[in-house]
């Protein structure tokens, strides 16, 4: 395994409610990052087919027709569309953590697929608890989604979605899995001019949630976020709402294991890819001071119990 790598964090606008359009754009970004020499590429949350911000503004009844289209344009993990992306990853020879709305039977999940340089999905996980009104359209990830670190030729790569970064115990379990590079997948988060809007759902706070992972975990963090431009408000079903008046919402960044910002940020309404040349040995330098699952821990006094069992809706008597 090479210790010196180039990593990439995507900041881009989805192709709203357009499955094939989203696949094509995702492939184009993979190809672009690979041409720049990237080895590991991180994508925003539900980049395909975009984050459904309208669930924060409309009632379920008002939103139903749009969500029906959203369901149709979400991607199945085993599908021709995913096969196209896997083929592009294989051709590029990179490692990708892809964020998308996963359609499985009659339910949607906020998913991340970890795709290696052979085009193989080596890890697949779902957000364990959708945030607030997300629960109206997305299901919960089960115990298998607690495993969020993949051992790859480019190091041990992890991923979490959005406010999963606020889940203290989930972060701690990730650190116990010995993460090197963490992909922090986010939607667009808009600067607010609405006094009632919770401050902890702002770019400043959400960026801070990811920043903490770099320092606690002594790992590199690729914060990848969506943007939303004003001309696409209607497509995203948020036209005329106060909380999207300040368009953009991008806040992508790459952090070092010491918590340093390694790149200059893009403008909130700017599409692009952030790149950083990294050396995984930096992790061990940081851990000399701070290893919260090692020498700087007291498991005899404080420890974590993990249940990786996947709960199922149907059990058979002879399995009990």
Swiss-Prot record:
Q: Where is the active site?
A: 45, 127, 162
UniProt-listed InterPro entries: C-N_Hydrolase (IPR003010), C-N_Hydrolase_sf (IPR036526), Nitrilases_CHs (IPR044149)
What CDD domains does the database record attribute to this sequence? nitrilases_CHs
UniProt note: pH dependence: Optimum pH is 7.0-10.0.
UniProt keyword Transmembrane present: no
| CN hydrolase domain boundaries | 5-280
Q: Kindly indicate whether the keyword Hydrolase belongs to this entry.
A: yes
Reactions catalysed, as given in the entry = a nitrile + 2 H2O = a carboxylate + NH4(+)
Q: Which GO terms describe its molecular function?
A: nitrilase activity
Q: What is the main EC category here?
A: hydrolase
UniProt keyword annotations, A-Z: Hydrolase
Give the EC number(s) under which this enzyme is classified.
3.5.5.1
Summarize the temperature dependence annotation: Optimum temperature is 43 degrees Celsius.
The family this protein is said to belong to: Belongs to the carbon-nitrogen hydrolase superfamily. Nitrilase family.
Summarizing the function annotation, the protein's role is:
Nitrilase that hydrolyzes preferentially benzonitrile.
Q: What name does UniProt use for this protein?
A: Nitrilase
The species is Gibberella moniliformis
Please spell out the taxonomic lineage of the organism that makes this protein.
Eukaryota, Fungi, Dikarya, Ascomycota, Pezizomycotina
């Amino acid at each position: 395994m090479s210790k010196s790598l180039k990593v990439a964090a995507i900041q881009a606008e989805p192709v709203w409610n357009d499955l094939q359009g989203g696949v094509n754009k995702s492939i184009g970004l993979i190809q672009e990052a690979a041409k720049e020499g990237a080895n590991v590429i991180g994508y925003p949350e539900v980049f395909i087919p975009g984050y459904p911000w309208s669930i924060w503004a409309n009632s379920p009844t008002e939103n139903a027709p749009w969500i029906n289209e959203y369901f149709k344009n979400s991607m199945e993990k085993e599908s021709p569309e995913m096969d196209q992306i896997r083929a592009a990853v294989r051709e590029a020879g990179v490692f990708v953590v892809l964020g998308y709305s996963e359609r499985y039977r009659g339910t949607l999940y906020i998913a991340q697929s970890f795709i290696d340089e052979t085009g193989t999905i080596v890890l697949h996980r779902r957000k364990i608890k959708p945030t607030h009104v997300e629960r109206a359209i997305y299901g919960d990830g089960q115990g298998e989604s607690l495993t969020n670190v993949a051992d790859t030729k480019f190091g041990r790569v992890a991923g979490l979605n959005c406010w999963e970064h606020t889940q203290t115990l989930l972060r701690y379990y990730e650190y116990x899995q010995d993460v090197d590079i963490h992909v922090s997948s986010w939607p667009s988060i808009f600067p607010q001019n609405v006094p009632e809007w919770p401050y902890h759902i702002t770019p400043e706070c959400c960026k801070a949630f990811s920043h903490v992972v770099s320092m606690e975990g002594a790992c590199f963090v690729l914060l990848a976020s969506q943007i939303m431009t004003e001309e696409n408000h209607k497509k995203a079903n948020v036209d005329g709402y106060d909380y999207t008046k300040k368009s953009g919402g991008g806040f992508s960044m790459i952090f070092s294991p010491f918590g340093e910002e390694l790149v200059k940020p893009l403008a909130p309404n700017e599409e692009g890819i952030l790149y950083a040349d990294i050396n995984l040995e930096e992790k061990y330098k940081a851990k000399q001071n701070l290893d919260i699952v090692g020498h700087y821990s007291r498991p005899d006094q404080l420890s974590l119990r993990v249940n990786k069992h996947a709960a199922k809706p149907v059990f058979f008597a002879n399995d009990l």
